[in-house]
């Protein structure tokens, strides 16, 4: 049954205009999003994209990570978030999400098309939680821009949330869209350390792209940011970028 005939498009219209959504509508939106992402996943598991898939897996996992066989493992959730939004395809340098949209926009349901358009506006964001509100929302701050955001509470609990750093793709306008969000333990000092290292990486990148902003760096090298966070969480005293590489 086409999703639009089930009234999903009207639900998405109402969500786009609403200040808040009910738990029931949130559940229906999650069903829509999961169905669409599964469809995209099947598309990219074809032989045509096997080289890209294996290349992306190597870039994401690095040389030391043991790749789990269980498809429900958090590793795979994080990988698909990276692959769809941040990886660049060999054939055209587009993100897989953008390529899927360009080649399938005439064949998907109208609601799926609108969700795709919103997902394409999502930005890789590193943030932390300031406090928990009493309406199932959390007040957050973007680590790099200091922008304040109100997001739904994570469904995995908020134990010691003041010492957690989170990152993933977020679209804040219209319907708040969050793909898989990764959380790692990080004190305030470690958060600042991570910020300093990533800004150093952006400075190195600007030797190649003179006018590159932090957003430009994230769009091109989000996997480097992911690895930097992982390295510093494990080995906080390591310099990821040598000071000798920086322009003085």
Predicted regions and their residues:
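Mixed-charge, low-complexity intrinsically disordered regions
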Residues: 1-126, 131, 158, 169-248
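Short nucleic-acid-contacting surface segments enriched for D/E, G, S/T with interspersed K/R
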Residues: 153-169
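Short strand-connecting beta-turns/loops that link adjacent beta-strands
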Residues: 134-135, 145
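Short aromatic-glycine-enriched beta-strand elements
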Residues: 136-140
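Surface loops and adjacent helix of pleckstrin homology
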Residues: 141-143, 154, 181
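A short macromolecule-binding patch
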Residues: 147-152
């Amino acid at each position: 049954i086409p999703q639009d005939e089930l009234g999903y498009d009207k639900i998405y219209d109402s969500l786009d205009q609403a200040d808040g959504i009910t738990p029931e509508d949130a559940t229906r939106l999650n069903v829509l999003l999961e169905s669409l992402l599964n469809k995209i996943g099947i598309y990219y598991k074809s032989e045509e994209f096997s080289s890209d898939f294996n290349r992306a897996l190597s870039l994401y996992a690095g040389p030391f990570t043991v790749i789990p066989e269980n498809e429900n493992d958090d590793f795979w959730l994080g990988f698909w978030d990276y692959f769809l939004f941040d990886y660049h395809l060999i054939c055209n340098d587009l993100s897989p999400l953008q390529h899927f949209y360009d080649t399938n926009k005439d064949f998907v349901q109208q609601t799926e098309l609108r969700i795709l358009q919103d997902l394409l506006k999502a930005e890789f964001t590193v943030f932390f939680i300031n406090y928990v509100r009493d309406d199932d929302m959390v007040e957050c701050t973007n680590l790099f821009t200091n922008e304040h955001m109100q997001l739904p509470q994570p469904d995995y609990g908020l134990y010691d949330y003041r010492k957690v750093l989170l990152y993933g793709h977020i679209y804040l306008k219209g319907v708040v869209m969050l793909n898989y969000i990764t959380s790692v333990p990080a004190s305030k000092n470690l958060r600042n350390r991570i910020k300093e290292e990533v800004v150093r990486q952006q400075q190195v990148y600007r030797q190649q792209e003179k006018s590159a902003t932090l957003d430009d760096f994230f769009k091109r090298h989000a996997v480097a940011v992911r690895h930097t966070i992982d390295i510093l969480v494990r080995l906080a005293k390591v310099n990821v970028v040598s000071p000798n590489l920086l322009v003085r």
